[in-house]
């Protein structure tokens, strides 16, 4: 059985156009946000949050956000919850992290996952930095 498909130029161009839409949408997200496709830490200012915490909003678009949080020893990420899904990486330091009713001590190289609307918090046992990823982005952080 031989199968043959002949396309004229306008049909072919239409197929290419619709196939490219996801690519166009992805590029629009990058332009709609803070525009940081390359993140240079030294170019981003710290925001003092008080209580021994400061934050850098590294980059974001409507679908995700990366934030760096510096904790002094004894700093507390007050227990809270939000609709955003969160993944965090311990860049340095030691933290006691509570997610729901579970508690774990985490150090450099460790990480954790927080589902939407689950109560969570952290206590810094040794000064350090957490890298947080949120989806969707935390609009409350940029207002």
Where are these regions (language model features)?
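Conserved short histidine dyad/triad with adjacent acidic residue
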Residues: 65-81
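Bacterial N-terminal signal peptides that target proteins for export
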Residues: 1-12
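Ligand-binding loop in jelly-roll beta-barrel domains
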Residues: 116-140
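Short acidic-glycine-tyrosine-enriched beta hairpin
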Residues: 102-116
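A cytosolic small-molecule/anion-sensing beta-strand core signal
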Residues: 91, 107, 126
């Amino acid at each position: 059985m031989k199968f043959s498909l002949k396309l004229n130029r306008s049909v072919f161009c239409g197929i290419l156009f619709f196939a490219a839409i996801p690519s166009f949408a992805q590029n629009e997200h990058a332009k709609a946000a803070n525009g940081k496709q390359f993140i240079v830490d030294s170019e981003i200012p710290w925001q003092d949050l008080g209580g021994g915490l400061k934050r850098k909003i590294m980059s974001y678009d409507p679908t995700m956000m990366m934030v760096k949080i510096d904790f002094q020893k004894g700093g507390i990420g007050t227990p809270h919850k939000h609709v955003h899904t969160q993944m965090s990486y311990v860049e340095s330091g030691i933290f006691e992290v509570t997610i729901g009713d579970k508690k774990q001590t985490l150090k450099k190289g460790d990480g954790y996952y927080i589902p939407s609307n689950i109560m969570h918090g952290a206590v810094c046992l040794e000064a350090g930095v957490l890298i947080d990823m949120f989806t969707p982005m935390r609009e409350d952080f940029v207002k």
